[in-house]
Amino acid sequence: MAGTPNYNRREFLATLGAGAAAAVVFDQSAARENAGLQSIRKRIEARTFPSVFQAWNPADNLKDEDKLTTIARHDLLFHGVGFFGLKWDHKHAGLATKFRKDSIRRGLAKRKELLDKNPNLILIAEIRYRDASRKWFPQDYKWWKRGKDGKTMLGWAEGGHLQMDFSQDAYRKHVAAQAGAAVASGVVDGVMLDWWRDDDDRLALMKLIRAAVGPDALILANANDRTTPRTAKFINGYFMECYRSATPFQWRKIAETLAWVEKNLRKPRINCLETWYHKSRKDLHLMRAATTLSLTHSDGYCLFSDPNTLSSGDHLHNWYAFWNKSLGRPKAAGRRNRDGSARREFDNGTVVYNPMGNKPLTVTFDAARTSLSSGKTGRTHTINPCDGDILLLKPSGSAR
């Protein structure tokens, strides 16, 4: 869409009505409340590794731990606006352009609680643009997407959501205003867009959203294992919801996409790699493979979770001891080999990734290392295919 304009924030506000424009102007009390917090970039750069994210639903295996403490084990969280305490100021949430003031106060209090527990945590609000519950708009509203028969269209086969028509320019501007309101609240650091791909309508929408949230807010988009070159410069990170990880080809595609986004998306980057278990949460080799792939190919975040086919709720997961902070910061970029394996040096040890389809990989060090996967200490360690390991200079402590 060559004719799609590139808006800046001032120009975007000028396209909106007065009420919607006011909603995306920063609330002064919110700005004062957050003045002492580290900047987004500093929080991203200050965190240590491994670095895990939460996609909507939590880690649910730490039954005796306070829920906010478990959330704060993660370094990035995205969720619906309601999770953060925000409530749209309209009977139909999809028609709102601002939040109730009391909900902004609740949201700021929850943000403070979480950042007190993890000062490097990044908070992202999902903005719905493609599908939503049937209550999002009035039943016959013009922004529902309809098929040739005039009937509304399901969001996806097994879900109860309906699709919205983001081919309409007025609707795209409205979505952008909602994104701007979320960031303007001061409760979150940016917005997340699901079901992302490159097409003319999404490009037009993305330009409006970037103008609405400003240059410093974060935009996360779920492109799965695909790349989106047309919208890349507006996006800080992909939520790589990788539902295909059964073959060597699929793992190669994941690795190639992760390497691409680390070079081509907007800085600061917040790429989030998720794979799902095949048989159970005890597929520890798959968890380690996803974690070490993320560590060797990116400065991003990882997650290993339940598959969406379960009825219990998408993206539920365990918190694994392998994810406890042990590595410190990376000392250099990862080094990738022709066979697809990779290695990266950190302050406190070395990460090795061995992809599906490879032979077992043996690594030897000048001095003894402790394997985080086995607990064994020695100079030589073997990593099986579709697995990875963290090899520490000294045994790991009890850091979360």
Predicted regions mapped to residue ranges:
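Bacterial Sec-dependent signal peptides at the C-terminal "C-region" and cleavage site
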Residues: 23-35
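Generic macromolecular interface patches on structured domains
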Residues: 22-23, 304
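Generic detector of low-complexity/intrinsically disordered segments
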Residues: 15-18, 28, 374, 393
